[in-house]
A protein has these predicted regions:
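Chalcogenol-based redox active-site neighborhoods
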Residues: 1-123
């Protein structure tokens, strides 16, 4: 389970990360590990993980190379304004490296995102 998030320590990203952390063991029991990716610098990622008690890896993709390859970097509308940035996306990748499901920005509800993932896995 890999997910991209726009910015550490913002309300939506914090809600999403905390949801995933709260259900980390349930996700692990189904064979999925959590990996977060954002454009934030490593120091901010570390502080975010420490202050929120996140016990999964956070990748600092400051050059957006991985984010672009994953299709998580592009045009979006924020507060009625078009910008280029991270598109909040989650990929469920199985043990063979095959993408089973992509949760798009329109599908993701940050506060209950882990439950959304578990619901999909258990359907």
């Amino acid at each position: 389970d890999s997910y991209s998030y726009p910015k550490a320590n913002t309300s939506g990203c914090t809600a999403e990360a905390c949801s995933l952390q709260a259900h980390k063991e349930e996700l692990a029991a189904t064979g999925y590990e959590i990996i977060g990716v954002s454009k934030d610098k490593q120091a901010l990622q570390k502080k975010f993980a420490e202050t929120k008690g996140l016990q999964f890896p956070l990748i600092a993709d400051t050059e957006t190379t991985l984010l672009q390859e994953l299709g998580c970097w592009g045009e979006k509308v924020t507060c009625g304004r078009k910008t280029i940035g991270i598109l909040r996306t989650t990929y469920l990748v199985n043990e063979e490296g095959v993408i089973e499901k992509i949760f798009t920005p329109k599908e993701i509800k940050t506060k209950i995102h882990a439950e959304q993932i578990l619901d999909y896995i258990h359907q």
